[in-house]
Regions:
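Active-site-proximal structural scaffolding
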Residues: 19, 62, 136, 169, ...
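The canonical Cys-X-X-Cys-His
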Residues: 4-5, 26, 69, 143, ...
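Post-cleavage N-terminal segment of exported redox proteins
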Residues: 80, 95-174, 178, 191-199, ...
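Extracellular low-complexity, Gly/Ser/Thr-rich intrinsically disordered linkers
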Residues: 245, 251-271, 275-348
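Single conserved hydrophobic/aromatic residue that forms the stacking wall/gate
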Residues: 1-7, 11
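An acidic, gly/pro-interrupted, aromatic-rich
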Residues: 43-71, 202-293
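Periplasmic c-type cytochrome electron-transfer domains
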Residues: 13-125, 129-148, 247, 254-263, ...
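Detector for the c-type heme attachment site
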Residues: 31, 189-195, 248
């Protein structure tokens, strides 16, 4: 995809649909503890299809993928409104219409015919003797290696505090930490070194946008984990995100419903009340007039909204404004010292010669 897909005025005129969900953060996804990815967990280390993973590609997942992160990296390429494009727009979109695994050979060829890329794959992978050997699995694992290195983060002030530096957190941040692990109940789900239990919970996050509808869904909605498991008890549940560098990953919620940490914290304290007080302006969507009429159509479906309200896994809690502010302050203490100074950064040029978005 070229620069013309950037969010300029020309592109806005081309927008036909919103992306259903907020992009997940990349921080620490190379950690072995991550075994399930995507908001609905549709990718996981498993052996359902004799290829090591339970994924949207099912038995058509390419051979040679070794990590869950490398496997995840090849799926945005197949998403129509992320990278694949619209029907009849290009050969990738056309191939996707036939079957998902028809996309990857096309993309792998585009990469390996660029001499510099081909040479780098030969140098990096033991089983690649020439550029012709490069497959989408090599590309996925190369992307995973980059993400694992570039977005590793374990040097936050909170890490220093745990290691014994009592001055690493301010008094208010320490107060927030005490609330996080105590009265506020945050650590019930945001636990462990990565601050996630990797499980799925229903929070009644305000719905909007196109949803992630299944073929038989008669209306716009996003049922979360249930879309993967078909289990009614998983309705509207979404994966607990890691809170590492959370202050850098706004907006919050699986669909980006809240633009601030305070907003998403207050929602956790009173899910139904926050749902009822939420306004469309909080979504902070790019202004696209011809989509705005349907962006919030799900709110007109009282049956769907009632189902959403009935499925909440957490209990309301009461915190005063000072306690909420302390929690927000503590969230900032989870930002790594080096999080804004990544090891590799954005290159000046890339082998394809395409413009680099700075």
């Amino acid at each position: 995809l070229r620069r013309s897909r950037g969010l300029g005025d020309v592109y806005k005129r081309q927008i036909k649909k919103r992306v259903p969900r907020n992009a997940s953060a990349l921080w620490n996804l190379g950690a072995r503890a991550f075994t399930v990815l995507f908001h609905d967990g549709r990718l996981a280390i498993a052996d359902d299809f004799d290829n090591g993973f339970n994924s949207p590609a099912e038995e058509w997942l390419p051979h040679g993928l070794e990590t869950v992160l490398g496997t995840q990296a090849i799926f945005p390429m197949t998403a129509q409104f992320e990278m694949a494009g619209n029907p009849k727009e290009n050969e990738v979109a056309g191939a996707l219409h036939d079957r998902i695994d028809a996309v990857w050979p096309i993309l792998a060829k585009r990469v390996r015919v660029i001499p510099e890329y081909g040479d780098m794959f030969v140098e990096t992978f033991d089983d690649v003797d020439s550029a012709a050997d490069v497959t989408i699995s090599h590309i996925g694992e190369a992307l995973a290696a980059f993400i694992a290195l570039e977005f590793r983060s374990s040097d936050a002030p909170f890490d220093d505090f745990i290691a014994g530096d009592m001055s690493a957190l301010t008094e208010n941040q320490q107060r927030g930490a005490a609330l996080f692990y105590g009265k506020a109940g945050c650590s019930d789900c945001h636990s462990g070194p990565l601050l996630t239990d990797q499980k799925f919970h229903a929070l009644a996050i305000p719905p909007f946008g196109p949803g992630r509808t299944r073929r038989f869904d008669p209306y716009t909605r996003d049922v979360g984990r249930m879309g993967e498991t078909d289990a009614l008890e998983d309705a509207y549940r979404f994966r607990t995100p890691s809170l590492r560098n959370v202050a850098l990953t706004a907006p919050y919620g699986h669909n980006g419903a809240y633009p601030t940490l305070e907003g998403i914290i207050r929602h956790h304290l009173d899910p139904i009340g926050s749902l009822d007080r939420w306004t469309p302006e909080m979504a902070n969507l790019p202004h696209v007039p011809w989509l705005e009429a349907i962006d919030f159509v799900v709110w007109d479906d009282r049956f769907e909204m009632d189902r959403l309200r009935r499925r909440v896994d957490i209990q309301p809690r009461e915190l005063d404004d000072a306690e909420v502010a302390a929690l927000v302050d503590f969230m900032h203490a989870l930002t790594g010292h080096s999080a804004r100074d990544l090891p590799l950064g954005i290159p000046d040029t890339v082998p394809s010669g395409l413009p680099v978005d700075k």
